[in-house]
UniProtKB/Swiss-Prot annotation:
The gene is rpsC. This is Small ribosomal subunit protein uS3. One of its GO terms (cellular component) is cytosolic small ribosomal subunit. It comes from Edwardsiella ictaluri (strain 93-146). Keywords: Ribonucleoprotein, Ribosomal protein, RNA-binding, rRNA-binding. It comes from the Bacteria.
Length: 233
């Protein structure tokens, strides 16, 4: 049976950046990775209703810098910056180093796979029909300029006894084209019948040239080898 590679993982370093951008030696790596996980867990719990798309973590010179990409920056910042200060203290306590928090606004939440998946799950939890939720997400994405979108839901759809999978696609979603800018994410809806999984793929176009490459010193051109002609015996 054919299996699909993770659309984001296969594109890392080609057209997709990493969510954690830091280097560490062997002794510190595991601790940094663990604190990254705990920081993300803490922020996702605190900002559950703030439409957080992704959290990028950097570690410059014994400190931690967290960039929160959100569709609702006002909820994250809070009144006079009180909420963001509380988050900064929480992150600094978990990481054990001074923390800095930056907020980046997501201009078009309808073209962000994580926010689209979360929107569908919240509708499913409010007992909206799954087909209507899927169609609405697809129409909004295509209206705002997506080249293609695919939405898949799986579980006890509509309270059915037997779990099944249904999907809806519009436009093209080329998973094998590495230069294709495909945003992929998942979410879970916890309903009275059980958990319903939601997957979203959004194709935004092709990125020609890829990510900015690190310039390397040019090697001297190799001299072409002279071919010796064998004389006739």
């Amino acid at each position: 049976m054919g299996q699909k590679v993770h659309p984001n993982g296969i594109r890392l370093g080609i057209v997709k950046p990493w969510n954690s951008t830091w280097y560490a030696n062997t002794k510190e790596f595991a601790d940094n990775l663990d604190s990254d996980f705990k920081v993300r867990q803490f922020l996702n719990k605190e900002l559950e209703k703030a439409s957080v798309s992704r959290i990028v973590i950097e570690r410059p010179a014994k400190s931690i810098r967290v960039t929160i990409h959100t569709a609702r920056p006002g909820i994250v910042i809070g009144k006079k910056g009180e909420d963001v200060e509380k988050l900064r203290k929480g992150v600094a306590e978990i990481a054990g180093v001074p923390a800095q928090i930056n907020i980046a606004e997501v201009r078009k939440p309808e073209l962000d796979a994580k926010l689209v998946a979360d929107s569908i799950t919240s509708q499913l939890e409010r007992r909206v029909m799954f087909r209507r939720a899927m169609k609405r997400a697809v129409q909004n994405a295509m209206r705002l300029g997506a080249k293609g979108i695919k939405v898949e839901v799986s579980g006890r759809l509509g309270g059915a006894e037997i779990a099944r999978t249904e999907w809806y696609r519009e436009g093209r979603v080329p998973l094998h084209t590495l230069r294709a800018d495909i945003d992929y994410n998942t979410s879970e809806a916890h309903t009275t019948y059980g958990v319903i999984g939601v997957k979203v793929w959004i194709f935004k176009g092709e990125i020609l040239g890829g990510m900015a490459a690190v310039e390397q010193p040019e090697k001297p051109a190799a001299q072409p080898k002279k071919q010796q002609r064998k004389g006739r015996k």
